[in-house]
């Protein structure tokens, strides 16, 4: 092997292959992280509930399913979900051609990613302080 070729191989960046679904999850995550403030709630259990409820209602809206609005919390999460679903339809038109099953998988992956980024990966101990 020539020295020039070996140097070129060393400089080459190696990246793990990314699936189309992961790429889409990245796009949607990026939108939330750069545009919306609800992911910055001060306690981990509130963040977890918000992620679950807002993204569940967003999925229901994107799939044309009924959304539970029976409590004031449901209605609060629904408002964020309506805005998010509308923005996703506008900024990411590929979501409009996905099946309900694909949207369900996409939104579950998005919830998992948001939980990781906003709860599980963080070292901020205030997030889990029971007295905060």
From Swiss-Prot:
Pfam families, per database record: AnfG_VnfG
Catalytic activity field: N2 + 8 reduced [2Fe-2S]-[ferredoxin] + 16 ATP + 16 H2O = H2 + 8 oxidized [2Fe-2S]-[ferredoxin] + 2 NH4(+) + 16 ADP + 16 phosphate + 6 H(+)
Single GO MF annotation: ATP binding
Coiled-coil ranges per UniProt: none
GO biological process, one term: nitrogen fixation
Cofactor(s) the record lists: iron-sulfur cluster
Organism domain of life: Bacteria
EC number annotated for this UniProt entry: 1.18.6.1
Keyword Nucleotide-binding: yes
ATP-binding found in the keyword field: yes
Keywords: ATP-binding, Iron, Iron-sulfur, Metal-binding, Nitrogen fixation, Nucleotide-binding, Oxidoreductase
Assembly notes: Hexamer of two alpha, two beta, and two delta chains.
Function (record text): The key enzymatic reactions in nitrogen fixation are catalyzed by the nitrogenase complex, which has 2 components: the iron protein (component 2) and a component 1 which is either a molybdenum-iron protein, a vanadium-iron, or an iron-iron protein.
NCBIfam families reported for this sequence: anfG_nitrog
UniProt-recorded name of the protein: Nitrogenase iron-iron protein delta chain
Organism lineage: Bacteria, Bacillati, Bacillota, Clostridia, Eubacteriales
Gene: anfG
């Amino acid at each position: 092997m020539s020295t020039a070729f070996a140097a070129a191989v060393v400089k080459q960046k190696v990246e793990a292959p990314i699936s189309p679904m992961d790429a889409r999850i990245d796009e949607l995550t990026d939108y939330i992280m750069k545009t919306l403030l609800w992911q910055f709630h001060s306690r981990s259990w509130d963040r977890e509930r918000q992620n679950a409820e807002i993204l569940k209602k967003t999925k229901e809206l994107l799939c044309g399913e009924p959304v539970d609005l029976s409590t004031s919390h449901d209605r609060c999460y629904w408002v964020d979900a309506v805005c998010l679903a509308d923005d996703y339809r506008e900024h990411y038109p590929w979501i409009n051609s996905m099946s309900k099953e694909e949207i369900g998988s996409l939104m579950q992956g998005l919830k998992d990613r948001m939980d990781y980024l906003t709860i599980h990966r963080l070292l901020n101990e205030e997030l889990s302080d029971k007295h905060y």
